[in-house]
Structure formats: structure tokens, C-alpha cells
């Protein structure tokens, strides 16, 4: 049976949505509210006069009309919670919740979110004070010329200034002259990026994303991108500037990362996500997010959709998008041209007759109405952007020509439109018709850019014997200049292994270079050699300059730590050899040792010699195939928070770089006191120590003599590994061992301990026939002992308990709110503020929350007939945000009995006296009248009787001679700012609960 659908909105986007939905065999009728002339009585499509701002009335309309799907076009209803309210009323609605829609409705929230999740964007800062904003513009070390109203401003709240004076004027226009009203109470000032702007949209069910063909909008009013900024004068799709590889990168580094980040923050995002991007020389960077289809992008993207839009949207709502991925027409291009009223984007006339619409249709074009209306049976203008003419052809040039023919056929007085929509794409295509090396996948220009970026990094590693200058055919090293008399050259080569896989998954490329250098230079130390120079090999399928620069910067920094020069290297771009986003590394180190100082000195090693163990920094660079398998089988992933303060991920911990020992151990090795040095690398303790021993000797080690890092304890437990497997695969906390004479052991140990953690861990013993070269005693006990060293184990069990989600209810300035925000931002906090609710609009507390990137909702108590109705509205929002605790911070409403009962033991309030004394609203006045010498504040659970709940925390404040209500109030407020966060921490941690009979229960 076919369904009815309701589309919310009145523009060209909504006409296009209705047009596409009406093509579905599952749909029998499409209502558009309020709609326009194009959606009035057009086949399956008709307009509705239902109020879209009254969500209760809208929900009733949907029930009465048996609406099976509501599709929200514009951003304002999304920010107002239309999806939340309709969904709560049992109406299926396509689009994000109000909380998720903050990605568009609060630019301050969005920029903070992007920074939190490492998604590339312009440098920025938000302000509520215009003077501070202008000071930032004038002092920033980058062009801070983009000024944005943080809130919704109908797509016009962004000013791109040409100089600092213009930027400051924009700030004052927005904040003082209220150009965009309340949307400009907070402004974001950000870096002016250079590049080409594109739009990348996707469908998403919160987990899976389905990218749409990339598009490009044209914001300026006139040809050649001249004139004022508008809501958009035309668009085209697909944008050929975005290659398949680049689109894949955008999908992974922007779209998927955004959805994953929202989900991790407890804000699942469903609907359409629109990323406005700048294609900079450093890669794509996010300019903005929209939480719906763009207008006019929608009018060029939907005509390219081969699939049933109704089915796709239902799959999104059902969270089954992966089983209903949309299919797009491959060999087609779409161009849409906007026709606007004379005077737009300023004031413009209305009611002008539009003719020629049927001629455009006869040309095979789609005309999507926007600012149109019906008057006396005629179509007339009723807005700034009046309509869009869309052509779908086999290529962009033809589509633009056809769209312009349609525009020429349509007429209304004073119409304005652009004739150059898609000019950037046409220029791009005309430059890239011939087959090139770059077309084949090798970008020589990108390689040259990389060389220029890394030249100064290599130059910084210069040392005696060579100047590290890249770009030649080979590098030179002068041993005599380095101070050598009779040297032996020593070389070593190595890679990083599958630790690279973790770096690539975590997109952390800045430390893997140290692993590469360490693996090579630590090896040649086994011959007693000083590392002189290093060469690297970086191989990939597609060169990402930013990634490669990060890796090589890490290599250069590591060379400085090792004391060797980065003399050269090879960057190999080989299309088809590696999957997108993957690369491989290899390194080659050359060192030297004077002929008489070479190691190991096998003939000197004797029974009773002592083994000194030098601490590793962690797993180093071996055993990662096993590590990855253990993580896959565990309950954790690489993004799981670990550490005492939860400020590190498991991926970060596993990517701790390998220690470089050359500078710290070389003086000891040259002292003549060390008989052998072994680098504990692949093969662990069992395989590496025998490499520097005579065949007739082995070693016995005591694992209880050194500290084993807890990462090994976790791997042992989680992987159910045997002692032998641990010792044969991992370094178990020992990165290198030295063999020294027993009588010199303490002296050598002290010398090593000046720079590294080290222990006496064993001794050399004669090897019995058939015996193992290395025996490690007490390894199991050491692993178990170290695993229980601390309650706050780095890796044990559930590494960091999930923070309790808190809502703060306010009515005013939010001074206590600010204290709560500051305390919950600390890594040690057990609480996280996920929502601030005010019963009054425009109060300072809301602005404080927005600056902190915390979602806000205004629920005006005056709009409800009773306390119970108001509390029910609050309760629905709390459930939407999965709130677990409530803090009342200057909330000037008495909560109803049913609400208090539902949230019993979950609501905290603060009172400005030491309860049970001086209850009520005038506590300070009562204190002064009573003549008491001590007052204070009390944090308590809320009960039905005012100020009568169980007391959690109190702080005393002296009453001074001459105190007034004002002076006493200020002193008590300071105590409140300490007491409220302390009480919240007690409750959120579970240390304090409400027990039987409403009494406090301490755990």
C-alpha cells in the first residue's frame, strides 16, 4: 500500500525533494508545508497550510493524514527540535535531532568538535566580546579574516573580509548592530583559507555513510564571483576537481570521522550531512557543516540519484543504510541556475508575473520553484531566489548550455541570474584532457612539494662529517672530519612492521619515524658503532604530502636524538601497489667504530658476568601482528581511553615510539667496561641475547628484578599467552642488555642510570648441552605482580569508566554553572555536562555553555499551563540527551512532585546556608538577622519538600562584622563554586548515594 509523505519547507530544495519522492511507487501523495507555486497541485504533490512551528499540531496532522514519513528541508526546524518532537509523538521523521543539528546551528560547538576529533579545519577562536574579537583579528599570526555568526543566519552569516579593518567592521556589525539578531551573540573568527570550495554530502544512519556526488555552489551574485554573498546562485554536480582518491580521503577523514565522533559523544547523527570544504594545498579542510540538503545543491544531486529516495530515507531511519545503499547515474552531469528577484540579496519586489515556465519544461528541463506563489491563477514572484532551472546531460558543458536556454525562456521583470555556473569545472576539464603521468597516479608536483617541505628538517640533522642537504643524487660523509682514525663501517637496515597498521588506523604518523630510526641505530650499537647517517624509504600508492611530511619529520627528529644525519632517502609513489591510505617504511643506518673498540668481545665473556637490562618505552616495534590480534579479540579498540586520567587512547599507548639508545649508551659502550650489547628486537629476550654470546654460554634472568610495563601484563592476560611466548615475542620491558664483568657491574649500572632506567637482571652461566641459551625465571609472577600494582591500571579491565552524563538547569547568569563546567573538563572528573537547559532565553548562562561547546535548550515555562506540563517538557529533553544526573544552578522554578519522584536521588541543588538552618529564598538576610557567626553553603539531593533533601556536602563561611547581604553573598558564592563541583564528583563517582528513608549512603 502506498504511503503519504510530508516535506517541510518552501524553497527549491523542498520542491526537488517532493519531486524525487513522488517518483517512488511506495508514495501516493506528497504534502509540502508551506510549499510554493511549484508544489501546489502538481500530480502527487500538493501544499498544506499546517503550522510547522507548532510541533504538537503538526504531529496531530501527521496522525490524522496517516503520514508515514516527514522530511525536513530547512535548518531552523531541525535546530528547534522538530525531529525530536515528532519522533516522540510516534511520527517517523528524516533528519538529525536538535542536539545533532548543533553541527550547523552552533559554529562554536562545531569548531570545538572538529578540534576534539582531529578533523582538519581553519584555525579559529570564538568571542562574545567584540573588542576581544577585534584584538584577536589584529594580533593573530595568520589571516584571521573570516567572521561568522555562530548561530543560524539563513546561510548569510559568514563575512569574508579583505583586510583587518573589514573584519573588525563585520564583528561590530554582527555583535553591536545585531545584523543577524541573536545568531550573532557569539562570533567565530577564523583563518582565511586559500583554495577551491566544494560541497560533499552523504546519507547516514549514524554508522554507515553513503556519499553523494560532490557538488560546487556559487555564492556570489554575479558572474566571475563578483557582487554580494547570497544563499547560492547555482550549482553543478559532480565536481570533477574531486578525484575518486580525494573523495575517499574526504569520506574517511571528514565524513566518517565526524559521524564516529558524534556517536562517541553520545549524539548519534541520522539524516543528511553536508560538509562545506576548502581544497587547500595541505588537503581538504572543513569550512562548515549543514545538517540537511543544500539549496541549490539539492537540485543537482537528486536528479543524479538512480535509487528510490523514499527507500533510502526509510533505510536511514531504520539504521539499515548498509543494506540499501543509493546508486547514482554514472555518466551524467547536472547544472542548476538560480533566477533571483531584482534587489536580491537586499530588498526586492514581490507579486511579479512569471512567464515561460512551460517553454522550459518543453526543453526537457526541470524547473524547481522557490520564492513563488499563485495569484489569480498566475505564478508570481514571492521571494529573493525565485526558481532554479536544472539540466541533466552527459557532460557539464552541455548541461550548462541547456540550463541557460531554460533561463532565457523564463521571464519576470528584473530577473537576475548567472551565466557562468560551473566555470571552474569547465576550466579544470579543459586543462586535463590529455593523458599525463599524474593521470596515471604519480604526482611529480606533490613529490617536489614534499621535498621542499622536508629539506629544512633534514638540514637540522647536519653533524660533523656532513651537511644533510636533500635533492642531489647521493650523500657524502667525511669520516676524518667526524674524528675517526682507523674506523670500521657498520651498517644496518630495518623496518617498522605491522606497527604501521596501527599508525594508519589511528592516523597518527608523527612518531612512527622514530621507530624506524631506532630499529636501525639500536642494531648497529651491537657492534659498538656510533650512527653517522641515515637514509629512509617511504613507499605508497598515492602520495599524501601531509602524511609523508609527518612521517619524515618524525624521522628527522629521531636522527637528531640519535646524533646522525638524515642524508637522503627515497619517496616512491607506486599506484596499485598499496591500498589508499597505506604506506610502508624502511630505513638504512651507517655507523663507525674504531677498530679496537668493536663489540661484542666474545673472548672476554665469562661465567658470572652480570647482565644489565635497560628499560624499554613499551612494546617498541616488534610483535605487532600478535598485538593487533589480541586487540581484535578484546573488548577494547585503538580509540579506547586508557591511563589513570583517561587522557590517552590504547592506540596512542601502543604507538609509544621505540627508545633510541645511541647517545645515552655510547659513552658506556666506549668505556671498555662492556663486553657485549644486545638490542631486544624481533624474537624478544629469548632470541636476541644469544646473538652476542659465545656458543658455550647462556644467561639466567630474574623477571622480578625489573619493572614490566603494564601493557605487557594486559597483553599476557588478554591474549592468554604463555611465558615462553611472551619472552620470545616481546621485550617485556627490556629494550637492551649489556654484559659486564661482575666487579664493574655497579659502576656501569650507575653510569647507565644517569640517562636510562636500568637494573641488574641476571648473569652469564655455562651452557649445558641441550639447555636453552636464555632462561627467564619468575616471569609469570612478575606479570601478575605488576598487573596488580595499581587500582588505576593503565590497561586493566574497563580502562576508564564512562563519565556520568549531567544536565544543568539554569535561569540566569550561571556562575555555579561555570564552576561545574570547569571542574568537569578535568580528566579526573567522573561527570560530563551534556546539556544546559534554561527556562529563560538570552541569559548569560546559555552563552557560557555555548562557549564551552555544550548543547543548550530553552524551555520557556510561560508557554505551559502548569508546572507538571513544563516539567514533562524538560523531562523529554533530558531523556533525549540520555541524562543521568541533574544539577540545579540558579534554577528559579520549583519542580513538581512527579518529576522529583522520577529523578529521586539524581537531582542536586545548592543552598546558600548551612542547612537545615535558614531555609528559603532570603538565607543571607536571615543569617544576618539571627546574628550567627558562621554560615556557608549546602549541596543536597532534591526532595519534594523545599531544601529538605539529604545533605551531600557543606562548606562553612565566617560571618564578618559589618557584613551586608551583598558582601556575605559574594563570599558564600566563592564557597559554592568549590562545594558544588566537589559534591557532583562524589555522586558521579558513586561514593555518595541516597539510601533507605532518604538518608545518605557512603560507599
Curated annotation (Swiss-Prot):
Trifunctional enzyme that catalyzes three distinct reactions as part of the 'de novo' inosine monophosphate biosynthetic pathway. CDD domains: FMT_core_GART, PurM. Its EC number is 6.3.4.13, 6.3.3.1, 2.1.2.2. The gene is GART. (6R)-10-formyltetrahydrofolate binds at residues 867, 892-895, 909, 943-947. Homodimer. Signal peptide: none annotated. NCBIfam families: purD (TIGR00877), purM (TIGR00878), PurN (TIGR00639). It catalyses: 5-phospho-beta-D-ribosylamine + glycine + ATP = N(1)-(5-phospho-beta-D-ribosyl)glycinamide + ADP + phosphate + H(+); 2-formamido-N(1)-(5-O-phospho-beta-D-ribosyl)acetamidine + ATP = 5-amino-1-(5-phospho-beta-D-ribosyl)imidazole + ADP + phosphate + H(+); N(1)-(5-phospho-beta-D-ribosyl)glycinamide + (6R)-10-formyltetrahydrofolate = N(2)-formyl-N(1)-(5-phospho-beta-D-ribosyl)glycinamide + (6S)-5,6,7,8-tetrahydrofolate + H(+). It comes from Gallus gallus. It comes from the Eukaryota. This is Trifunctional purine biosynthetic protein adenosine-3. The record marks 947 as: Raises pKa of active site His. GO terms for biological process: 'de novo' IMP biosynthetic process; adenine biosynthetic process; purine nucleotide biosynthetic process. In the N-terminal section; belongs to the GARS family. N(1)-(5-phospho-beta-D-ribosyl)glycinamide binds at residues 814-816, 973-976. Residues 434-805 are annotated as: AIRS domain. Mg(2+) binds at residues 288, 290. Residues 214-235 are annotated as: Disordered. Residues 806-1003 are annotated as: GART domain. ATP binds at residues 190-193, 197, 220, 229. Keywords: ATP-binding, Ligase, Magnesium, Manganese, Metal-binding, Multifunctional enzyme, Nucleotide-binding, Purine biosynthesis, Transferase. GO terms for molecular function: ATP binding; metal ion binding; phosphoribosylamine-glycine ligase activity; phosphoribosylformylglycinamidine cyclo-ligase activity; phosphoribosylglycinamide formyltransferase activity. The N-terminal ATP-grasp domain carries the phosphoribosylamine--glycine ligase activity. The lineage of its organism: Eukaryota, Metazoa, Chordata, Craniata, Vertebrata. One of its GO terms (cellular component) is cytosol.
Amino acid at each position: 500500500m502506498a504511503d503519504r509523505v510530508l516535506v517541510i519547507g518552501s524553497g527549491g530544495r523542498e520542491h526537488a525533494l517532493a519531486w524525487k519522492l513522488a517518483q517512488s511507487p511506495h508514495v501516493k501523495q506528497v504534502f509540502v508545508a508551506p510549499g510554493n507555486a511549484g508544489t501546489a497541485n502538481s500530480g502527487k504533490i500538493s501544499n498544506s497550510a499546517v503550522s510547522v512551528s507548532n510541533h504538537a499540531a503538526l504531529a496531530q496532522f501527521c496522525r490524522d493524514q496517516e503520514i508515514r514519513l516527514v522530511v525536513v528541508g530547512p535548518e531552523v526546524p531541525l535546530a528547534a527540535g522538530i525531529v525530536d518532537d515528532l519522533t516522540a509523538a510516534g511520527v517517523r521523521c528524516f533528519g538529525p535531532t536538535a542536539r545533532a543539528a548543533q553541527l550547523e546551528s552552533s559554529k562554536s560547538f562545531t569548531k570545538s568538535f572538529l578540534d576534539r576529533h582531529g578533523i582538519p579545519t581553519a584555525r579559529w577562536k570564538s568571542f562574545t566580546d567584540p573588542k576581544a574579537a577585534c584584538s584577536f583579528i589584529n594580533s593573530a599570526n595568520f589571516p584571521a579574516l573570516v567572521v561568522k555568526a555562530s548561530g543560524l543566519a539563513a546561510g548569510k552569516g559568514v563575512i569574508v573580509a579583505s583586510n583587518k579593518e573589514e573584519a573588525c567592521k563585520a564583528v561590530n556589525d554582527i555583535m553591536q548592530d545585531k545584523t543577524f539578531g541573536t545568531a550573532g551573540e557569539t562570533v567565530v573568527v577564523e583563518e582565511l583559507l586559500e583554495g577551491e570550495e566544494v560541497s560533499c554530502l552523504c546519507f547516514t544512519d549514524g554508522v554507515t555513510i553513503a556519499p553523494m556526488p560532490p557538488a560546487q555552489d556559487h555564492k556570489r551574485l554575479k558572474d566571475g564571483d563578483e557582487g554580494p554573498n547570497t544563499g547560492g546562485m547555482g550549482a553543478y554536480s559532480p565536481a570533477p576537481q574531486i578525484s575518486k582518491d580525494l573523495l575517499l580521503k574526504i569520506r574517511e577523514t571528514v565524513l566518517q570521522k565526524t559521524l564516529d565522533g558524534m556517536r562517541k559523544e553520545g549524539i548519534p547523527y541520522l539524516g543528511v550531512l553536508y560538509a562545506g570544504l576548502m581544497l587547500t594545498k595541505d588537503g581538504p579542510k572543513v569550512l562548515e557543516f549543514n545538517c540537511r540538503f543544500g539549496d541549490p545543491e539539492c537540485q543537482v544531486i537528486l536528479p543524479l540519484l538512480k535509487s528510490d529516495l523514499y527507500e533510502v530515507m526509510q533505510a536511514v531511519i531504520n539504521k539499515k543504510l548498509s543494506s540499501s545503499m543509493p546508486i547514482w547515474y554514472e555518466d551524467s552531469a547536472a547544472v542548476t541556475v538560480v533566477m533571483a528577484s531584482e534587489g536580491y540579496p537586499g530588498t526586492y519586489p514581490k507579486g511579479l508575473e512569471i512567464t515561460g515556465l512551460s517553454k522550459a519544461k518543453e526543453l526537457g528541463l526541470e524547473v524547481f520553484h522557490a520564492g513563488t506563489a499563485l495569484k489569480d491563477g498566475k505564478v508570481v514572484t514571492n521571494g529573493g531566489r525565485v526558481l532554479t532551472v536544472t539540466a541533466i546531460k552527459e557532460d557539464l558543458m552541455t548541461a550548462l548550455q541547456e540550463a541557460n536556454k531554460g533561463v532565457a525562456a523564463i521571464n519576470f521583470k528584473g530577473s537576475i541570474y548567472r551565466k557562468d555556473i560551473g566555470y571552474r569545472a569547465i576550466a579544470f576539464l579543459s586543462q586535463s584532457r590529455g593523458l599525463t603521468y599524474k593521470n596515471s597516479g604519480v604526482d611529480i608536483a606533490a613529490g617536489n612539494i614534499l621535498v621542499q617541505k622536508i629539506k629544512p628538517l633534514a638540514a637540522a640533522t647536519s653533524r660533523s662529517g656532513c651537511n644533510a642537504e636533500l635533492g642531489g643524487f647521493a650523500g657524502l660523509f667525511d669520516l676524518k672530519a667526524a674524528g675517526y682514525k682507523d674506523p670500521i663501517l657498520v651498517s644496518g637496515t630495518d623496518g617498522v612492521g605491522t606497527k604501521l597498521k596501527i599508525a594508519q588506523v589511528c592516523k597518527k604518523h608523527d612518531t612512527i619515524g622514530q621507530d624506524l630510526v631506532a630499529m636501525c641505530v639500536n642494531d648497529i650499537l651491537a657492534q659498538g658503532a656510533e650512527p653517522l647517517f641515515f637514509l629512509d624509504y617511504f613507499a605508497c600508492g598515492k602520495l599524501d604530502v601531509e602524511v609523508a611530511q609527518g612521517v619524515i619529520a618524525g624521522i628527522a627528529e629521531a636522527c637528531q636524538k640519535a646524533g646522525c644525519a638524515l642524508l637522503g632517502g627515497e619517496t616512491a609513489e607506486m599506484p596499485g601497489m598499496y591500498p589508499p591510505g597505506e604506506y610502508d617504511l624502511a630505513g638504512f643506518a651507517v655507523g663507525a667504530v674504531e677498530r679496537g673498540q668493536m663489540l661484542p668481545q666474545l673472548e672476554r665473556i665469562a661465567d658470572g658476568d652480570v647482565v644489565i637490562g635497560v628499560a624499554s618505552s613499551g612494546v617498541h616495534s616488534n610483535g605487532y601482528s600478535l598485538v593487533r590480534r589480541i586487540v581484535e579479540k578484546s573488548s577494547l579498540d585503538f580509540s579506547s581511553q586508557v591511563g589513570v586520567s583517561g587522557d590517552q587512547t590504547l592506540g596512542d599507548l601502543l604507538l609509544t615510539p621505540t627508545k633510541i639508545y645511541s647517545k645515552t649508551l655510547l659513552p658506556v659502550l666506549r668505556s671498555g667496561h662492556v663486553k657485549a650489547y644486545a638490542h631486544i628486537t624481533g624474537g624478544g629476550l629469548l632470541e636476541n641475547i644469544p646473538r652476542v654470546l659465545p656458543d658455550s654460554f647462556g644467561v639466567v634472568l630474574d623477571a622480578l628484578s625489573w619493572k614490566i610495563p603494564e601493557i605487557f601484563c594486559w597483553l599476557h592476560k588478554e591474549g592468554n599467552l604463555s611465558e615462553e611466548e611472551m619472552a620470545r615475542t616481546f621485550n617485556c620491558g627490556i629494550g637492551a642488555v649489556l654484559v659486564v664483568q661482575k666487579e664493574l657491574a655497579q659502576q656501569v649500572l650507575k653510569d647507565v642510570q644517569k640517562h636510562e632506567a636500568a637494573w641488574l637482571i641476571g648473569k652469564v652461566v655455562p651452557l649445558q648441552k641441550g639447555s636453552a641459551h636464555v632462561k627467564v625465571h619468575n616471569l609469570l609472577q612478575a606479570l601478575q605482580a605488576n598487573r596488580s600494582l595499581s587500582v588505576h591500571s593503565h590497561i586493566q579491565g574497563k580502562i576508564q569508566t564512562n563519565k556520568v552524563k549531567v544536565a544543568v538547569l539554569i535561569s540566569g547568569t550561571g556562575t555555579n554553572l561555570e564552576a561545574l563546567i570547569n571542574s568537569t573538563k578535568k580528566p579526573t572528573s567522573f561527570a560530563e555536562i551534556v546539556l544546559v537547559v534554561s527556562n529563560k532565553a538570552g541569559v548569560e548562562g546559555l552563552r557560557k555553555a555555548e562557549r564551552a561547546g555544550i548543547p543548550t535548550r530553552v524551555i520557556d515555562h510561560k508557554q505551559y499551563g502548569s508546572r507538571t506540563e513544563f516539567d514533562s517538557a524538560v523531562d523529554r529533553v533530558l531523556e533525549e540527551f540520555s541524562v543521568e544526573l541533574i544539577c540545579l544552578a540558579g534554577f528559579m522554578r520549583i519542580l513538581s512532585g512527579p518529576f522529583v519522584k522520577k529523578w529521586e536521588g539524581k537531582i542536586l541543588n545548592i543552598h546558600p546556608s548551612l542547612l537545615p538552618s535558614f531555609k528559603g529564598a532570603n538565607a543571607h538576610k536571615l543569617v544576618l538577622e539571627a546574628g550567627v557567626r558562621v554560615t556557608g553553603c549546602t549541596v543536597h539531593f532534591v526532595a519534594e519538600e523545599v531544601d529538605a533533601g539529604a545533605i551531600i556536602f557543606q562548606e562553612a563561611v565566617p560571618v564578618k562584622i559589618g557584613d551586608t547581604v551583598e558582601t556575605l553573598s559574594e563570599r558564600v558564592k566563592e564557597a559554592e563554586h568549590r562545594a558544588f563541583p566537589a559534591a557532583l564528583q562524589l555522586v558521579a563517582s558513586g561514593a555518595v548515594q541516597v539510601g533507605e528513608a532518604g538518608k545518605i549512603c557512603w560507599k
